[in-house]
């Protein structure tokens, strides 16, 4: 049996803060499927957010032969204070990346694929055309595979959003990440209301589409503020919600304020379901793509 290990990320917490609780420990990744996915990603020169963002669920997901593909390289043009993905000047767009991703999806015989990306403010459409092309090629090479896209805000470029929507993903996800009071410090180059507008526009343009959002807690928000964000997301008819514990990637990042208890996560879930969400994942280790294959069935009725 694999040992229990602390999560990869390290918190920049004062020394008098409580140690990380037992519920934030995971099994060390391993197993034949895990190594098969790892090898394929290296062979195809592909990136996954599972690795780049130090996801605690990488062992579980890769052993189920699922992964979240990170499009548009692994260097982001923004500097969000919570994110472990590298920042700086990215390489030119790799026009062949969609073919390699689609081939990998087919090779792994995935029934559900998640596509996300770094922010690419250096290109006019923010990389939307790469999302669209990847969806189209997955449809060709793995027609039984459902596709979720976890998209950036495209800096408010709604034509870019339509480019992605026109490729007909099964689930459109855009994470709100945190509460309005912390938003500009947590995500200096983004706006809370712009993210809400993106989700509203997606719903208006494709009423049948499953829409999804997620946030992290334990970053300094109050529980009341979490409930208010849940309300705002329901106001724009988001179907699926994920809520997980924020873990700081290191000393230069936004610090963890506290560890939210499993009981509080359960209460967030209860409230969100009561408000009308079709599916809610709420727990310390939940990340945006956790159990994503279950979310595709959360269509409106």
Swiss-Prot record:
Its EC number is 2.8.1.8. The keyword Metal-binding applies. It is found in: Cytoplasm. Keywords: 4Fe-4S, Cytoplasm, Iron, Iron-sulfur, Metal-binding, S-adenosyl-L-methionine, Transferase. It catalyses: [[Fe-S] cluster scaffold protein carrying a second [4Fe-4S](2+) cluster] + N(6)-octanoyl-L-lysyl-[protein] + 2 oxidized [2Fe-2S]-[ferredoxin] + 2 S-adenosyl-L-methionine + 4 H(+) = [[Fe-S] cluster scaffold protein] + N(6)-[(R)-dihydrolipoyl]-L-lysyl-[protein] + 4 Fe(3+) + 2 hydrogen sulfide + 2 5'-deoxyadenosine + 2 L-methionine + 2 reduced [2Fe-2S]-[ferredoxin]. It comes from the Bacteria. Residues 62-278 form the Radical SAM core domain. One of its GO terms (molecular function) is lipoate synthase activity. PROSITE patterns: RADICAL_SAM. The keyword ATP-binding does not apply. [4Fe-4S] cluster 2 binds at residues 76, 80, 83. One of its GO terms (cellular component) is cytoplasm. [4Fe-4S] cluster 1 binds at residues 50, 55, 61, 289. Pathway: Protein modification; protein lipoylation via endogenous pathway; protein N(6)-(lipoyl)lysine from octanoyl-[acyl-carrier-protein]: step 2/2. Belongs to the radical SAM superfamily. Lipoyl synthase family. This is Lipoyl synthase. It comes from Roseiflexus sp. (strain RS-1). The gene is lipA.
């Amino acid at each position: 049996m694999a040992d229990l290990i602390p999560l990869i990320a390290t918190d920049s917490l004062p020394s008098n803060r409580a140690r990380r609780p037992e519920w934030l420990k995971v099994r060390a990744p391993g197993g034949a499927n895990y190594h098969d996915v790892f090898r394929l990603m290296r062979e195809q020169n592909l990136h996954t957010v599972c690795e780049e963002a130090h996801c605690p669920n990488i062992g579980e997901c890769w052993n189920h032969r699922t992964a979240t593909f990170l499009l548009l390289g692994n260097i982001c043009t923004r500097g969000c204070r919570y994110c472990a993905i590298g920042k700086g000047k990215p390489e030119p767009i790799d026009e062949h990346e969609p073919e390699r991703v689609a081939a990998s999806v087919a090779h792994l015989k995935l029934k559900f694929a998640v596509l996300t990306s770094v922010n690419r403010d250096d290109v006019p459409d923010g990389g939307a055309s790469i999302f669209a092309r990847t969806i189209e090629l997955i449809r060709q090479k793995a027609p039984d595979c459902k596709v979720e896209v976890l998209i950036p805000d495209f800096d408010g470029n709604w034509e870019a959003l339509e480019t992605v929507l026109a490729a007909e993903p099964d689930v459109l996800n855009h994470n709100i990440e945190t509460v309005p009071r912390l938003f500009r410090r947590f995500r200096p180059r983004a706006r809370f209301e712009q993210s809400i507008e993106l989700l509203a526009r997606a719903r208006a343009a494709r009423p049948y589409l499953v829409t999804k959002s997620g946030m992290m807690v334990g970053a300094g928000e109050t529980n009341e503020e979490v409930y208010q964000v849940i309300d705002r997301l329901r106001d724009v008819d988001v179907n699926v919600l994920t809520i997980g514990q924020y873990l700081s990637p290191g000393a230069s990042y936004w610090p963890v304020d506290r560890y939210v208890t499993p009981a509080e996560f359960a209460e967030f879930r209860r409230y969100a379901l009561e408000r009308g969400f079709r599916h809610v994942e709420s727990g310390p280790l939940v990340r945006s793509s956790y159990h994503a294959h279950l979310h595709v069935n959360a269509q409106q009725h």
